[in-house]
Amino acid sequence: MSFNIWWLILYFSIVCQAKAHYSLRDFKANIFQVKYQWKYFDYNFGSDEKRQAAIQSGEYNYKNNVPIDVDRWNGKTFVTILRNDGVPSSLNVISNKIGNGGPLLEPYPNWSWAKNQNCSGITSVYRIAIDEWDRLWVLDNGISGETSVCPSQIVVFDLKNSKLLKQVKIPHDIAINSTTGKRNVVTPIVQSFDYNNTWVYIADVEGYALIIYNNADDSFQRLTSSTFVYDPRYTKYTINDESFSLQDGILGMALSHKTQNLYYSAMSSHNLNYVNTKQFTQGKFQANDIQYQGASDILWTQASAKAISETGALFFGLVSDTALGCWNENRPLKRRNIEIVAKNNDTLQFISGIKIIKQISSNIYERQNNEYIWIVSNKYQKIANGDLNFNEVNFRILNAPVNQLIRYTRCENPKTNFFSIFL
């Protein structure tokens, strides 16, 4: 084969790849499957009598149950519900029973933890994390509605037997912004080097801080940075022509196991930032010496929850776009390298939770590229404005294969896909 013919073949291959990129990207949302959906949330109370008693006492009010996060382990699907009046349980699993609103929830690990007498149980959980040691890390902010009722805490369960492994209260001076008196820990990111050498990075969305927990000695440190604070230009959110306002700081975070970069952004901003966690885990560090990096105004809307794949594809909800965006950390952090990989004005209204979960297959040919992205969407604009229609589907859990979402996009790793460098 002559040199010119080889280049001609290469040229047409690149053109075909590029055309596939632009024709397929519009159909990425169809890759997502709705795994669960609800008009409203209800619970398996054990009997109709107990359910009616919960309604009459005000323990349960279907209008006040808002989902935030999802995670999966060994066939169990976890869902978190923000604690408020009428929310009987914040940490739950989806049962196989169906109610009028959708699948019924069951408290995890049991109802006694949901009752939370004398702050011995669980108050309110935004997000959770599961590590490679089959441990469920629960970040409890201790807030019900707008009221602080219990200390913030980390609760760890052994998923193999649902037994408590650890329950650690976050010290008051760590959990709270000493200037404003505000606190709201919302996102835990777990970094496990081994069973004991485990670190947890915690976002304080209202106190504008990153809290670091060392599992080995139960120590905490609170860090502050201008990158954790909201941008006043971007406190207004608009989804499907409906607006609301938030002054939210650091919220969505994701940890790359290859680079050990912790990616994050203040929710009410258009920024994307990161900090390398080796600064925290490899010896003592001084807060003033921490190097925070990233790009300001790189996004065109606010970004919500985040998760990162093994190949370095960082996913994040794009709020006003009702879309899922991504960027591969093996590419320069430039706007041209950020893609929308799925968009749907109905099913992707405010992505509040994202996880990337490996799906084990018995087929040897499917054991690679077996990562699935799981997301929660909750129509937060209607929650904020109090105009949810409980006669229609409001809340969804969806999933999709990561490799199919990023195929023929700039979110593919350029080191492993030759043609992606031309996209």
Swiss-Prot record:
The keyword Signal applies. Glycans are attached at N110, N118, N177, N196, N345. The keyword Transmembrane does not apply. Expressed at very low levels in the hypopharyngeal glands of adult worker bees (at protein level); expression peaks at 12 days post eclosion. Secreted into bee venom in the sting apparatus (at protein level). Expressed in the brains of adult worker bees peaking at 12 days post eclosion (at protein level). Expressed in the spermatheca of adult queen bees (at protein level); expression levels are higher in mated queens than in virgin queens. Along with Mrjp8 expressed at very low levels in the head of worker bees compared to other major royal jelly proteins. It comes from the Eukaryota. It is found in: Secreted. Residues 1-20 form the signal peptide. GO terms for cellular component: extracellular region. Induction: Unlike many other major royal jelly proteins, not down-regulated by the ecdysteroid 20-hydroxyecdysone (ecdysterone or 20E). Keywords: Glycoprotein, Secreted, Signal. Belongs to the major royal jelly protein family. Component of bee sting venom. Component of royal jelly, a substance produced in the hypopharyngeal gland containing proteins, free amino acids, fatty acids, sugars and other nutrients, which is fed to developing larvae by worker nurse bees; may be present only at trace levels. All larvae are fed some royal jelly (also known as worker jelly) early in their development but it forms the principal source of nutrition for larvae destined to become queen bees. This is Major royal jelly protein 9. The gene is Mrjp9.
